[in-house]
Amino acid sequence: MTQRSLVLLKPDAVRRGLTGEIISRIERKAGWQITALELRTLDTETLEQHYGEHKGKPFYEPLVEFMASGPVVAMVVEGERVIEGVRALAGPTDPIAAAPGSIRGDYGVIVRENLIHASDSEESAERELKIFFPGRV
């Protein structure tokens, strides 16, 4: 089933010069295509919309601060089972638990600065794509 997913390469990925490597891993998957890509620094309003469900949790403020600390690469990735697939390619949120060969397993350092975000469901993808690519998707 063809799906669309929002993928964000977080400020640590951009700062460490890993965007090319991560994008290359996504592009090498047969049948997946990056249909939109932007480099941008996220404002508070966008971050509040994106992470609103976590407001009030202990990690919310540090997460928003980190995500606003530098540019991110925002992408729309389309393809067969892309939501499940990109999340598998990324690996678990905790880089220590992530297997070698996954993005976080190979390059991740700490939980909050874990390089990549990918939509976790079709519903999340639809909501997130409207936030990051309004009018385009």
Curated annotation (Swiss-Prot):
Q: Name one GO biological process term.
A: CTP biosynthetic process
- Where's it mainly located? cytoplasm
- Could you name the domain of life of the organism this protein comes from? Bacteria
Give GO cellular component annotations, separated by semicolons. cytoplasm
Question: One short Pfam family name for this protein?
Answer: NDK
Q: Which CDD domains match?
A: NDPk_I (cd04413)
Q: Where in the cell is it found?
A: Cytoplasm
Q: Where does ATP bind?
A: K10, F59, R87, T93, R104, N114
Indicate the family of this protein: Belongs to the NDK family.
Which protein are we looking at? Nucleoside diphosphate kinase
Species this chain originates from: Streptomyces coelicolor (strain ATCC BAA-471 / A3(2) / M145)
